């Protein structure tokens, strides 16, 4: 099958159609942020540092809610949309003959991880069949409505939390009360937090569109918002002389524009008002969302601890580590595009019990992930030694970066596989395993980080991070290789 990894058959076209726009959308925001940074840098170094701290704080708080919300929404919407499209006329006819038929069919359409979870999914999908009569009408997708409500609530909670606690939170981030960074940092964080509801709402809608296997609409909306942000930045900052406040206002406007575009497009396809409150899927979202929240905390703690350990080794090591880490993480955005496509296609295939497509899709995205990782390793191996000078001209920092480059380059195939395995497991709605396995991986990795960094300093940190990513990839491989959980069907293949 490896010879056909790049073949543009039906699965290959589906993967490309979803993965490429998803990867472009994921890279659009970092590019816009770089433009933001360039404009803010024109004001002064204090303002640049202040905004950097505020953005780091905002992103850290947002990440806790964003990842579980988007991942859960993508899988659930894909499942419900697929089931809603499965011969609606036949389902309606059969339901007139006997009400028990719907229950038995819906049970068969759900991958059974365990009896309790299967019963829960079967019960929720009965209500979906009741409201999913699609006759040239907008679709009824309960998980889409649920995601938007949860996203809006989380956005308002985040805004209130960041605005009311801006000063103490910035103090916690290292900006003291007498620091010249405090006032601009507080101004920027307070204003940017007004856009939190739009950020969470737009990402919830991106999850819905991903569930529909549509990543082009989020791409167009994101590009429109980012272009607006780039245009408004110099106008508000320099013409209106609002400084860092102008940058924050421009960003907030762009986020609300993205939300409006996505909401407009979504309302054309989906009836967002459910027939009644009981059709919403809050319980399912909260259960699986909390599992992924636990996973996000484990991942964040490992990366944050590694940065903290590098900082303890001095400014030179920390500067070199930040350059290596940013390159290491940025390349993962391309693998995330594959993960998104794998998740959406697999969730749909599992809902239809099309195990042949499940096997073919999982195999293809993993092969593409490995190929992507090898390509990134070659590109970074050839270019990073020279490209490092774009980040710094300090000789000592460049020397330490050269020590980290072999790890950054060598782990690219492992990283790509780890991220794609995440998408594969999410597509199988295997959220519990993903969460618990990541906690175990984090515990082992934290021990390695503490021991190796104390013994081998900078190299030790990167050896530990290599172990961390290897364990993440191994956990994904183990689940499929042992044919357990949603992959039990492989035993009969």
Regions found by a protein language model. Give the residues of each.
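Membrane-interface helix-capping segments at transmembrane helix termini in multi-pass transporters
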Residues: 11, 121-124, 129-145, 161-192, ...
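Interhelical loop/hinge segments that connect adjacent transmembrane helices in multipass membrane
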Residues: 1-19, 93-109, 113, 248-251, ...
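Helix-terminus/linker motif at the lipid-water interface of multi-pass membrane proteins
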Residues: 27-49, 170-179, 235-241, 293, ...
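Alpha-helical transmembrane segments of multi-pass membrane proteins
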Residues: 164, 177-205, 283, 327-331, ...
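Transmembrane helical elements of multi-pass membrane transporters/channels
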Residues: 17-36, 191, 225, 254-258, ...
């Amino acid at each position: 099958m490896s010879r056909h990894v790049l073949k543009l058959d039906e699965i290959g076209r589906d993967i490309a159609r979803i993965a490429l726009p998803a990867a472009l959308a994921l890279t659009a925001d970092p590019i816009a942020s770089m433009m933001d940074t360039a404009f803010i840098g024109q004001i002064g170094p204090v303002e640049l540092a202040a905004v950097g701290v505020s953005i780091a704080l905002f992103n850290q708080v947002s990440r806790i809610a964003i990842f579980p919300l988007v991942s859960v929404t993508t899988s659930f919407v894909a499942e419900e949309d697929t089931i809603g499209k499965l011969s609606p006329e036949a389902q309606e006819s059969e339901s007139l003959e006997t009400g028990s038929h719907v229950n038995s069919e819906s049970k068969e359409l759900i991958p059974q991880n365990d009896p309790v979870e299967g019963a829960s999914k079967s019960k929720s999908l009965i209500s979906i069949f009741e409201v999913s009569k699609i006759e040239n009408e907008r679709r009824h997708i309960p998980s889409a409505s649920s995601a938007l409500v949860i996203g809006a609530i989380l956005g308002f909670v985040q805004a209130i939390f960041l605005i009311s606690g801006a000063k103490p939170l910035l103090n916690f981030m290292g900006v003291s009360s007498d620091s010249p960074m405090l006032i601009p940092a507080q101004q920027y964080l307070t204003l940017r937090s007004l856009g939190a509801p739009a950020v969470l709402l737009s990402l919830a809608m991106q999850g819905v569109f991903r569930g529909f296997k549509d990543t082009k609409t989020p791409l167009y909306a994101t590009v429109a918002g980012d272009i607006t942000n780039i245009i408004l930045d110099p106008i508000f900052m320099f013409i209106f002389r609002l400084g860092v406040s102008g940058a924050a206002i421009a960003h907030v406007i762009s986020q609300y524009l993205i939300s409006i575009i996505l909401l407009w497009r979504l309302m054309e396809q989906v009836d967002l008002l459910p027939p009644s409150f009981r059709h919403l899927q809050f319980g399912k979202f909260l259960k699986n969302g909390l599992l992924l929240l636990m996973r996000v905390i484990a991942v964040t703690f490992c990366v944050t601890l590694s940065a903290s350990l590098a900082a303890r080794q001095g400014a030179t090591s920390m500067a070199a580590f930040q350059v290596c880490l940013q390159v290491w993480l940025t390349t993962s955005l391309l693998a995330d595009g594959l993960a998104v496509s794998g998740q959406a296609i697999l969730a749909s295939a599992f809902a239809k019990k099309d195990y042949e497509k499940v096997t073919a899709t999982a195999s293809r995205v993993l092969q593409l992930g490995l190929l992507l990782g090898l390509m990134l390793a070659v590109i970074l191996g050839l270019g990073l030694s020279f490209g490092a000078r774009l980040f710094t001209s300090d000789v000592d920092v460049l020397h330490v970066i050269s020590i980290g480059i072999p790890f950054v380059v060598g782990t690219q195939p492992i990283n790509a596989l780890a991220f794609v395995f995440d998408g594969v497991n999410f597509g199988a709605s295997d959220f519990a395993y993903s969460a618990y396995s990541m906690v175990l991986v984090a515990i082992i990795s934290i021990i390695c980080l503490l021991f190796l960094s104390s013994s081998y300093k900078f190299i030790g940190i990167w050896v530990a991070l290599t172990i961390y990513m290897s364990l993440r990839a191994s956990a994904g491989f183990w689940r499929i290789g042992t044919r357990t959980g949603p992959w039990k069907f492989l035993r009969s293949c």
